[in-house]
Amino acid sequence: MMWFDPANPEVLFGDQRSETVTVTDRSHRTDGTRTLRIEPDALLDFRALPFADGAFKLIAFDPPHLTRAGPRSWMAAKYGKLGPDWRADLRQGFAECFRVLATDGVLVFKWNETQVKVREVLALTPHQPLFGQVSGRGGLTHWLVFMKPRAA
């Protein structure tokens, strides 16, 4: 989804699902559908990453950001949806990212604050971003960059 070259051997794309879904949306296709393919290299849960401490120098963390979505929502089908314990899930996700991140490693975090403000999410981790960029329609998508400190 964010990768320019999903076949790059230096990249490991993980998701908790592997599926192909056809959804109805306002696409420009004549039949009004869109086919989504979620094809991760590894099935995993960001709350319990199956990697050794310090295994990665760079991590891109792009968790689901929707708390509400209809049963046929293409956004939920594409990006996933947060569960009722989303605060605990994201807190654990940040902890796991920093656990498997090498010292001085970089975490790139992407968040869209249409439903949950980025400040609420940042309150779930003791780490502060070094810098970031706001993008997207309405300036709601945040790209934040963290670096794992030596003492973390």
Question: Where are the model-predicted features located?
Answer:
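Class I S-adenosyl-L-methionine-dependent methyltransferase catalytic core
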Residues: 1-152
